[in-house]
Amino acid sequence: IRRELFNSEELLALPALGESIELLGLLACYSAPAALFMPDGTLNPDLPRYLSEANTLNALWLKVSLGHFSDAQPLEALRTLLNASGMALVVENDQTDCGQLAPMQRFQTACRELALPVTLTFDMGNWLWVGDSPEEAARHLAPAVSYIHVKAAVPHKDNFRAVAPDRADARWLDLLGQLPADAPRGIEFPLEGADL
């Protein structure tokens, strides 16, 4: 469930949506279009609200981007928030400099050293947007990955365009094989025509 698709009135109806999800026996994850860390390296002050919304939806986890992680100092405060909420947190490599392999590795290493229960969303195509190798990212981050955004990326004008992995070269399907087989996968490419 993508928070950015809700207007303010619809956000007030999250409890009803959460009830429907539970009634229908569905599983959901909640994605907030926000960074975990602010430009000054502090935790996003809206994180408690996002965690609460995820709980209201009975989501399996809250997904955010990394943002400006600089050091481990705020991670104990993050632990406190996560323990209080009972919500799992996954952090995605986005299409900004903050989503590059080096900061993602630093964050993942800090979480591992502090035994902080935060895992990663591995967006397969986003690595190209930030100039990194998806395969190298998989080699370094796969053990921490708990959710995969499945998409391939092909050059398009001055950037890239997301496409289905089976519409691109074999590299993308090979990449999936380097990631945890038991990690849930979300579609992150356009569905068109016969794919619908």
Locate the predicted segments by residue:
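Catalytic cores of phosphodiester-bond-cleaving enzymes
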Residues: 71, 79-97
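Short, surface-exposed alpha-helical recognition segments that flank or form part
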Residues: 38, 42, 95, 163
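N-terminal pre-domain/capping segments
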Residues: 1-56
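Conserved hydrophobic residues forming the short capping helix/wall of the S-adenosyl-L-methionine
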Residues: 18-21, 82, 111
